[in-house]
Structures are given as C-alpha cells and as structure tokens.
A protein has these predicted regions:
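Hydrophobic residue at the +6 position relative to the catalytic HRD Asp in the kinase catalytic loop
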Residues: 294-298
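Conserved ATP-binding subdomain of kinase catalytic cores across diverse folds
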Residues: 37, 45-250, 302, 311-345, ...
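Short Lys/Arg-enriched alpha/beta "domain-start" segment
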Residues: 1-30
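Conserved catalytic-loop position in the HRD/HxD motif
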Residues: 290
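ATP/Mg2+ or Mg2+-diphosphate-binding catalytic cores
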Residues: 348-351, 355-372, 376, 380-418
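Exposed beta-strand-loop-beta-strand "reactive/processing" segments of non-cytosolic proteins
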Residues: 19, 24-54
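An alpha-helical support segment within catalytic cores of ATP-dependent transferases
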Residues: 100-104, 251-287
Length: 418
C-alpha cells in the first residue's frame, strides 16, 4: 500500500497527470520487468472515467535530478526510469532501432501529456522518443498515421523509426487483455521553429507570410493525398452528414448558452450549417484532426513538417481513427492564421490574415493530393471551429473572446457564403 501511495503521490504532481480536478485513487493494474526498469501501469479510478497511466520505474544509488525521485527503497532511490539511459536506450532497442551509435539522451521539458526523450548519435541529436503517459486500448492514430506517411516517403513528416506495444489486464475485453502503444520513435529535427511562433512574429511586424502559407498549403495537401491513398476512405453517408450536423449544433447550443454574442448569431450560423448539408461532400479519410500553426515545424533548409497526429484531444481515442472530412484540417489552419493576426497585429491585422488564407487555399487547391474544397462546406467548418473557440475563450481567456467572434462575423459575411 505504501508503495502505491508513494507512486500515486508522485504521478499526481506531474504535468501529464490528467486528473487535476479530483483526488486520485490509484491501484497498480500491472507491473512487469522491461530492459532497465519495471513498467508499472497505474489505474486512477477517481474520475468520471478510469484513466490508465504508464509509469516505468527503476532503482538507483544516487538520483541525477530531484524531480525524478519517486520514493526511497532499501537499496537506493526509486526514480522515474525515463531519466535513466538503461531504460530509454533499452526501449529504443525494443522498437528495433539501431542503438549502436547512441551516445546520450535527455528528457525534454515542457511536455504536457507525454514524455519526450531526445537521443544523440555520435554527439548529435538525431532521434526523439515519445513515451505515452496515458494509455488507451487499440490503435494510436499518432503512430499509425506517421508510420504510414513515413513509409510512403512523405517529405512533410519526420521519418518514423519504430513503436512499442504493451498489453495489460482488462476484464471487459475479449480474453481479458487490452493492448496499446506505449511509445514511438522518429527522426529528431534540429534547428526547427514552430509555425505559430514564426507566424506571430510575422504578423506583429506585418511581414509578408504568404510564401510560407503557400508551402503549408502544399504540405497539407500532400499529407491528405498520402493518407487517402494508404488508409481507409469512405463516401459520406446520410448518417455521417446527420452526425456531423448534430455535432455542429451541439457545440453551437453550448456556445449560445454561455456567450451572448454567439446566441445573437445562432440563427445565421445554423443557416450556414443547413446550406452545407446540401452541398457535395468529399470522401471521408484519415486527417490530422487538430491542425493549427503550432502543429507544424519549419526546418532550416526550407519547408514544413507536420507533427502530432493524435487528433482532437477531447475526442475518445477510438473516434480519432474514424475517417473524417479533409476540409476540417483546412479550416483549422485558416482559423490559426486569424489567431496569429489578431494576437500579433491586433485590429489592423485583417489584411495580413486574409493574404495568408488566400495563399494557403490557392496552394492547397493546386497541389497534388488535395481534396476539392466546397466553399459552403468549408465555411461551415470554419464557423464550427470559431464557435468552439468562443466557448473555450469565454471559459478560460475572456480577453481573447473577440478573436473567435470576429471569425464568426467574417464567416457570416456575404462574400463567405458561397
């Protein structure tokens, strides 16, 4: 019991622990030896839904960082094994990655939901391992999608190197066993900057960003084309359309109840939704699912790499693998340009954002792999995104609420309605 309490107390203090709103109630679901550590799986039963945490631990005589210490043992200190090279290099080797040239590793700080470890080969950082802290049964879209894109030779994602699966007891599943991905490794991109930081600077300085926006349009189209060729696609059925419309209206009802300005516009928004339901819909396929400027990296020799294909964080994992509308990714990027403009340049940044949007759309439409963009359907998806943003900002950052409200008004303007 004391061991579980010590480990649980440490887990509850970590940034990746998702149960901040409740008092945790942990139990050890599984513990098995792995190279360099013991992999503990802790179930937190205290929330509305149980959550399973991945906690590899090892014992050392002397810890290298105080934050890694989980507790004391008779023979030393119990620490987070992600801080120990025997475990991290062992995990890489389990994935089938050649570790013969690995000379060191370090844990990246700032991660919110996972733990990322960078490995040096011959003194240069070349590999990054993402260790998932919250585990889910079944496919992880971040792994599946990046593997497929890398295998297809896509120049728009980091090269995929390997992944590692684990299984654990689950009485609710066939044979009493669940399985899922505990981590994956890919090429580490040196000297990159995220698109959000670059775009924000450009908007603040009113620098032309249209060439970068065009390159982004080509990259997103290329990813859509590769995913459509390699993974399942499907025609949008009447049931798909009905379910999408219900989700739009559910988010609109929530926003209208919390944001008076959205309530004032709800009839006009719903009219756009109704019009979109009558338009031709593209085939459904795998998409990024949570695309914005923070999910793209500019590499030093030019071009973009798209990362973090986990999908919308609030959606259940199994839903994120379901084929979806490619224009949803496009809408996410259009809204991201608006955010960069509003926060970087203020009220005078509308022209900058409009130029970025136009350049992105033109390049996407003309690139190989792109999906036809019906303007009314795209506008409905932009509206849905802005409506969701309005709820989020009203709850968390009221000072930012004007940004999605301006986006809603722009999408309702006559020239946006197709």
């Amino acid at each position: 019991v004391q061991f579980t309490n010590d480990v649980g107390a440490w887990v509850a203090q970590q940034r990746w622990y998702a149960g901040k709103s409740h008092e945790p109630r942990f139990r050890i679901l599984d513990a098995r030896p792995v190279p360099g550590a013991t992999r503990y799986l802790l179930m937190d039963d205290a929330g509305s839904l149980p959550a399973l945490y991945h906690v590899p631990l090892t014992v050392v005589a002397s810890p290298t960082t105080p934050d890694s210490v989980v507790g004391r043992e008779a023979d030393g200190y119990l620490i987070d094994a992600t801080q120990h090279p025997d475990f991290t290099i062992g995990m890489l080797a389990e994935m089938g990655v050649d570790v013969s040239r690995v000379t060191g590793s370090r844990v990246l700080t700032g991660e919110q939901s996972n733990t990322s470890i960078v490995f040096d080969e011959d003194g240069q950082p070349t590999i990054i391992l993402k260790l998932f802290r919250t585990l889910h049964h079944g496919e992880n879209p971040d792994v599946t999608v990046q593997r497929v894109l890398s295998d297809a030779g896509s120049p728009f994602v980091p090269r995929f190197l390997g992944s590692l699966e684990a299984e654990w007891p689950d009485v609710g599943r066939e044979h009493g066993v669940a399985h899922g991905t505990v981590g994956f490794a890919q090429e580490f991109l040196r000297g990159v900057r995220d698109g959000w930081t670059i775009a924000l600077e450009a908007a603040r300085e009113q620098r032309n960003f249209t060439e970068a926006a065009r390159d982004l349009g080509v990259a997103v189209a290329g990813v859509h084309g590769a995913l459509g060729a390699a993974l399942e696609t499907a025609d949008a059925t009447p049931e798909d359309v009905t379910a999408t419309a219900a989700a739009w209206r559910r988010r609109l009802a929530i926003a209208a109840a919390e944001v008076p300005a959205v309530a004032d516009r709800s009839a006009a928004i719903d009219a756009v939704y109704r019009a979109a339901l009558e338009r031709p819909w593209p085939r459904l396929q795998r998409i990024h699912g949570d695309l914005h400027l923070g999910q793209v990296l500019a590499v030093p020799d030019g071009g973009w790499r798209i990362v973090d294909f986990e999908g919308e964080p609030l959606r259940p994992m199994e839903e994120r693998a379901i084929p979806d509308l490619p224009p949803r990714d496009v809408a996410g990027m259009l809204r991201s340009f608006d955010y960069a403009s509003a926060l970087g340049a203020g009220p005078d940044g509308g022209g900058w954002a409009a130029a970025c949007r136009a350049a992105f759309l033109e390049a996407y439409a003309g690139a190989g792999g792109s999906v036809a963009l019906d303007p009314v359907l795209l506008n409905a998806l932009v509206l849905d995104k802005a409506v969701y943003e309005a709820t989020y900002e009203a709850r968390n950052r009221p000072d930012w609420l004007p940004v999605p409200l301006a986006g809603i008004d722009a999408a309702l303007a006559p020239q946006s309605l197709g």
